UniProtKB/Swiss-Prot annotation:
Keyword Cytoplasm tagged: yes
Residue ranges, annotated region (Disordered): 121-206, 286-305, 322-414, 552-611
Subcellular location field: Cytoplasm
Highest taxon of source: Eukaryota
Pfam families: Clr5
UniProt GO cellular component terms: cytoplasm; nucleus
The keyword Cytoplasm is assigned to this record: yes
Ranges of biased composition (kind: Low complexity): 133-158, 381-411, 560-572
Name this polypeptide is given: Uncharacterized protein C29B12.08
Gene Ontology biological process terms, A to Z: silent mating-type cassette heterochromatin formation
InterPro entries: Clr5_dom
Length: 689
């Protein structure tokens, strides 16, 4: 007996030097690695005789090995961490990983210990998603390539006692051939940085399958086990493509070559910039072509016919047809089959557009030939990025300029519907909500004016329609431009031009219109003075008398006595008049028709109201007046109901700047005396803290 112990002495001493080693673990290791079996009691006895102190067990628990692994430090723990990491990146199942660890270290870990260790190493896998189930084969395919023959055979032969577990990985070749038969694009598999992939991963799946048939490069090693990928793998761990968003294809960064012909990016943007139904060949950038050709925007000359099909030929050559089209088709749309990833022959030739009549922008219309009058509501949501040539304009873009009086009166089309609704009139009603269907007849071809960038959906009204902005809010009926001199006055870039009286800048297209300020005219001053007088006799309301404002000055009122019958004042008006004048904000009244405020842009909200209601809006009543940010809100006096809310919910009370302006709440002196004795919560009204 003692002889045996003496043989094993230096092995035991070596193991016992490892930092967190406990007696039970020592016993387990010796029996695994050297097939040396002895009871724990005998270990204690012998170690005591040799004068070797080994840690007592730190955790009295059924999972001692787990505890040991947790506390193991030094060489064991480093090696263990490395192995766990490798197993993780090779996507081994838990069962296999545990078997590997047991084989290499003699540590019989529990699953829980393994997970704990992974957590410590910050190895996290995104939680399995129900959506991703079809993709689960992909990383496995990549892995079986990683576990190449030389790695695994070397690591298997290096320690003969190891019995590596039988792998759960499927046969890589089956996976590959099945994926290539389904036209699975490798673009979806490999991560954006190709550097981290083994050299044969970048190849097309079909060639991979062929290569395998020629000489089996991908088969797992002859021993039948797939074991760990060796260490170089740890330096640059495998990048699995993010599975979480597998539904939406990955957007590849633009290749530089595709960047421009005529300044027009050929690659399609990912989903956000893409309107829903534009087929794959079409590019969304109708305007940039023209602005590159004529940067100053003044000489809009027709281009020669060679450019007519340019967006076609490029998009069919520069983008591989079998790559995914990024816009989302659903299978019930007729255009679906044509751009399906597997379809290698494009269904159209390069000189014939994909859809016959109206679907795709071929060339830019130079100069708007006509704009059909559309009522605002059907126009606003999507004015058009696209423009589709009329059926007869295949000969060349010059038709539209040379024959401005031609019979077709094209109308604006919305970006969503145009391409495909005009082609399939029967679907027009069903797929798009009513407000989006084109207001012209279905067969009519759609055409947009030249500076199509002004009509993207965020800029509400495009330049030229904003120029005619009649007070009844519908567009002028089909203004058409006959002489080229008029063309030069429509500027490509927004700036002050004769067309917009206010000289609006870009931001005004999508923010609310700001009324031009006007110096208060005589009428409004009369109103103010009469209001001052009316403080004494509380009941009366100041109204514009017929003398103060004649019929000509007040085009909106129905007659001098209109205020009593037609426009009954709101209940708030009473209390508003009763207060002394200092509580009103001296805002200028609404712009007066009598002055030279340009007529084209009437204030859209107030245009139907009579003048004394304008007064009511421009002088909000006292309650609202405490909250200065609301004074401009046209319905300010309707918001009084919110005073009943508790102040934290109350949008009017919240911001703290209010109280500096409002004498009703606190005098300024009171504010500055105390200083911030109480903590200041920005989102809570300070009176209630």
């Amino acid at each position: 007996m003692t002889k045996e112990w003496e043989c094993r002495r230096e092995q035991i001493i070596e193991l016992s030097k490892i930092n967190g080693m406990t007696i039970r673990e020592l016993q387990a290791r010796m029996s695994k690695m050297y097939k040396f079996d002895a009871s724990i009691r005998s270990y204690k006895r012998v170690l005591a005789r040799w004068g070797i102190r080994v840690h007592r067990q730190r955790f009295v628990s059924p999972r001692t090995e787990e505890a040991a692994a947790r506390t193991a430090s030094g060489d064991v723990s480093k090696a263990l961490d490395e192995l766990v990491t490798q197993l993780f990146h090779a996507r081994q199942s838990d069962k296999d990983s545990l078997a590997q660890i047991e084989a290499n270290f003699g540590l019989k870990l529990s699953k829980r210990a393994l997970h704990y260790r992974r957590k410590r190493l910050a190895l996290k896998r995104p939680p399995p998603d129900s959506h991703d189930s079809p993709n689960n084969s992909i990383p496995l395919m990549a892995n079986s390539c990683l576990l190449s023959a030389d790695n695994s055979s070397s690591s298997t032969t290096s320690n003969p006692n190891v019995a590596p577990p039988i792998s759960t990985l499927p046969d890589p070749v089956a996976t590959i051939s099945s994926s290539s038969s389904s036209h699975l694009d490798m673009g979806a598999i490999h991560p954006p940085h190709h550097s981290s992939l083994p050299p044969h991963m970048g190849v097309d799946p079909s060639t991979m399958a062929d290569a395998h048939n020629a000489h089996s490069s991908l088969t797992p090693p002859q021993s039948g086990y797939s074991s760990m990928p060796s260490l170089p793998y740890l330096q640059q761990p495998f990048q699995i493509p993010s599975q979480r968003f597998s539904r939406q294809q990955q957007s590849h960064p633009f290749p530089a070559a595709q960047h421009a012909v005529n300044g027009q990016p050929q690659a399609l943007y990912p989903f956000i910039y893409q309107s829903r139904n534009v087929p794959m060949g079409s590019t969304m950038f109708a305007s940039s072509n023209q602005s590159a050709a004529h940067p100053d925007g003044n000489n809009a000359l027709p281009m020669d016919n060679t450019h007519a099909n340019i967006s076609y030929m490029q998009s069919s050559q520069s983008m591989p047809v079998n790559s995914y089209s990024y816009d989302r088709y659903t299978p019930n749309q007729p255009s679906y089959l044509e751009s399906k990833p597997g379809n290698h022959q494009p269904s159209y030739t390069s000189e014939q557009p994909m859809y016959s009549t109206a679907s795709v922008p071929q060339q830019i219309s130079n100069g708007p030939t006509a704009v059909n009058g559309l009522p605002m509501n059907s126009y606003t949501p999507h004015s058009n990025h696209l423009h589709s040539p009329s059926p007869n304009s295949n000969s060349g873009p010059t038709d539209s300029l040379s024959a401005p009086n031609s019979t077709s009166s094209p109308s604006m089309a919305h970006a969503n519907g145009a391409s495909f609704a005009s082609q399939y009139p029967s679907l027009n009603k069903s797929i798009f909500p009513a407000s989006y269907s084109s207001s012209a007849e279905d067969g009519q071809n759609m055409q947009a004016p030249a500076h199509a960038y002004m009509q993207s959906s965020i800029y509400g009204v495009n330049q030229e329609q904003k120029s005619e902005y009649p007070s009844n809010l519908s567009m002028q009926s089909s203004m058409s431009i006959k002489d080229p001199s008029q063309l030069q006055r429509i500027h490509l870039y927004p700036q002050h031009s004769q067309y917009d009286p206010n000289g609006m800048t870009m931001r005004d297209h999508y923010s609310e219109r700001i009324e031009p300020e006007a110096k208060p005219s005589d009428e409004t001053l009369t109103v103010r003075s009469s209001r001052d007088l009316s403080v004494h006799n509380v009941g009366t309301l100041p109204v514009l008398s017929a003398a103060a404002a004649t019929q000509a000055a007040m085009p909106h009122t129905m007659g001098p006595s209109a205020h009593d019958s037609a426009s009954a004042p709101s209940p708030h008006m009473q209390s508003q008049q009763a207060l002394p004048y200092q509580y009103y904000n001296p805002l200028p009244a609404m712009a007066d028709p009598a002055q030279n405020v340009p007529q084209q842009l009437p204030p859209p909200i107030h245009s139907h109201l009579s003048d004394d209601q304008h007064i009511q809006y421009s002088y909000p009543n006292t309650f609202v007046n405490r909250f200065p940010q609301n004074i401009h809100h046209p319905s300010a006096n309707l918001l009084d109901a919110s005073a009943a809310l508790n102040p934290v919910q109350n949008p009017l009370l919240m911001p703290q700047q209010n109280h500096e302006h409002s004498p009703l709440v606190r005098s300024d002196a009171a504010l500055h005396d105390h200083g911030p004795l109480l903590p200041v919560y920005p989102d809570v009204d300070s009176r209630f803290v």
